[in-house]
Structures are given as C-alpha cells and as structure tokens.
Amino acid sequence: MSRFTFKQFHINQNSCAMKVGTDGILLGAWADVKHCKNILDMGCGTGLLALMLAQRTEENCQIQAVELDPIAAKQAQENINNSVWKNRIQLTQVDIQHFLQTTEQTFDLIVANPPYFEQGIACKNEERELARYTKQSHLNWLEWAATRLSENGRISFVLPYEAGKTLTKSTALFCIKQTNVITKIGKTPQRMLLTFAKQPEVLMQDQLVIYDADNQYTEAFIELTKDFYLKF
C-alpha cells in the first residue's frame, strides 16, 4: 500500500523501506503526552509517530523528527508538509547519535520504534536493511535518548517481547510502564510497549490483546486507536 489514510492525516510511503505498521500505530497512540512541550521522534521513517503525536498534543508542543535515510526523510517531510501540523514538526536528516550529541535541546518525551533485528539474513535492499537491522543495540538507543531527556521526561519504545525483556534488565533507567502486546487472545506476547524515566516510580504493567477469539478487534484496541483508524 503506497498511501495510508488516517482520520486526520495521510501517509505516503511508496519511497520508504519500512511501511506503516501496527507497532508504530500502537506506540503513537499509547505514549503518554501529558504536559509535553518538546518531543523527539528517533528514526521517524514515514513521519507516522511525529504526526500521531502532533494530533494528540496541544498547539504549543513542538516535535523534532530525526531520520538517517535521505529517501525516507524526504517522504516524511512531504507527509509533514501535507498535514495541518507542519509548523509544529521539524525534521532533520542526520544520524540520531550525531543529533543527540550536538543538540542542546532537552525533551519531555522521546519515542522510538527502533530497528529490531540486530543480526540475521541480509534484506533484499539497502534501505530496508538500514531500517530493520542495527549494529547498535536497543540499549545504545535508550542511553543516547537519556542524554537529552528532561529531568521528569519519559522515553517510550516499542520492541519485540524478548528484546523488551532484555532491555529492562540492562538499563540504569527506571521502567515505569510496560504493556505486553498479544496479537490474539490465548497467544503469548509478541511485542512490548515500554516507558522509562530517570526517577523511580511504581511500575504499571498490563497487557493489550489486538484480536479476540473470533478474529475481531478487541474493545481495548479499538479504544486505544479509534482517533486514528478510519475503520473505527
């Protein structure tokens, strides 16, 4: 699908290696945006997360999107320009580590749907390999993000379930919210939505099931995503 239409914006994705997927939509709808004035989207791809978060936040919230791949960055910029939030979203085409090392800005919320295979069979094209595979671990991404996080800020990731478990055990940051994502009732979790903070809080844990036993969307999934999906 070269174009994905949401209730308040469109995503053109014919030039992007990684298309709009459930992981990104879940993160964009789930991340806590209360009191956010500055948000960072690490590795923005099509611009999906930046646009979802712009829809969910107040007019005084500014969003910085960063994307390394020039082709994806160009299409993300087009998607941003076609939205009503183009004046609130700034996109920079640069390596995320370099960006974080050179910016003086701190962020109240940092989000990422990071590359999720750290090793494996090579992808068929360079852009898709760049989007899916990483020589840097998820812990690297989290530690980089923490350097520009405001004192009471949050970092939210979506990861494969086992990678999420590993990350929570590896970081010095505090995991304050964890939602295990189950594709269909009765199955084991496949994804994990995580929020980290600098200060300790009581961990909130729950689960989200996408499909019920009859292969219908659950009420919880509909409630979470209804502001975005046309079908809801």
Curated annotation (Swiss-Prot):
EC assignment: 2.1.1.223
Keywords tagged on the record: Cytoplasm, Methyltransferase, S-adenosyl-L-methionine, Transferase, tRNA processing
PROSITE patterns: N6_MTASE (PS00092)
GO molecular function: nucleic acid binding; tRNA (adenine-N6)-methyltransferase activity
UniProt catalytic activity: adenosine(37) in tRNA1(Val) + S-adenosyl-L-methionine = N(6)-methyladenosine(37) in tRNA1(Val) + S-adenosyl-L-homocysteine + H(+)
Superkingdom: Bacteria
Cell compartment(s), UniProt: Cytoplasm
Gene3D superfamilies: Vaccinia Virus protein VP39
GO annotations of cellular component type: cytoplasm
CDD domains recorded: AdoMet_MTases
One Pfam family matching this protein: MTS
Single GO biological process annotation from the record: methylation
Location, primary (coarse class): cytoplasm
Family that this chain belongs to: Belongs to the methyltransferase superfamily. tRNA (adenine-N(6)-)-methyltransferase family.
Known role: Specifically methylates the adenine in position 37 of tRNA(1)(Val) (anticodon cmo5UAC).
Protein name, UniProt field: tRNA1(Val) (adenine(37)-N6)-methyltransferase
Organism the protein comes from: Haemophilus influenzae (strain ATCC 51907 / DSM 11121 / KW20 / Rd)
Lineage: Bacteria, Pseudomonadati, Pseudomonadota, Gammaproteobacteria, Pasteurellales
